[in-house]
Amino acid sequence: TFTYETDWGFRFDTSLRWQSNRTVGNLHYYRVSDGEEIRKIRTTDASVGLNYNPGVTYVNTKQQRLPINLDSPEISLRHTMGLDGFMGGQYQSNLTTLGIYKRQWLGSFGYMDFNIVGKAQWSKVPFTMLIQPPVNLSIFEQEATISMMKDWEFLSDRQLFWSVAWDMN
């Protein structure tokens, strides 16, 4: 992973990821064309991301870096490309993500957080590489997620997700 960040809120990052997933238990993948079982799925991904967050300030701790000014708007654009044949990658994929975040203060009525995320999978990929909605599987509330929904319930190649959270202080 390489990250370049400026003082005025612009960040550019790029990364290369390789992973290999095997099926376990009663889960089996079969190719539709010939019925052959696929025992392992290997992917190699290259990502490029742009992020613009003007006016953000951070606090550095020993283990992490936390933003303390959540009032600034954030716009992010990321493209992830699956590389077929490179380092064992078996599938070509192209996933583009565009996200917008903004916090709006309402005076003595608290504040509202607005999140909008759009994703598009441009290539024909296996169902395990399709887009999943942000599902909250825990018993704790998490912002910008959907509760009371099962994992892997709605897979698609296009997604537009928005959420509004109102904290009344």
Report the location of each language-model feature.
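Exposed, low-structure sequence patches enriched in small/polar residues
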Residues: T1-N169
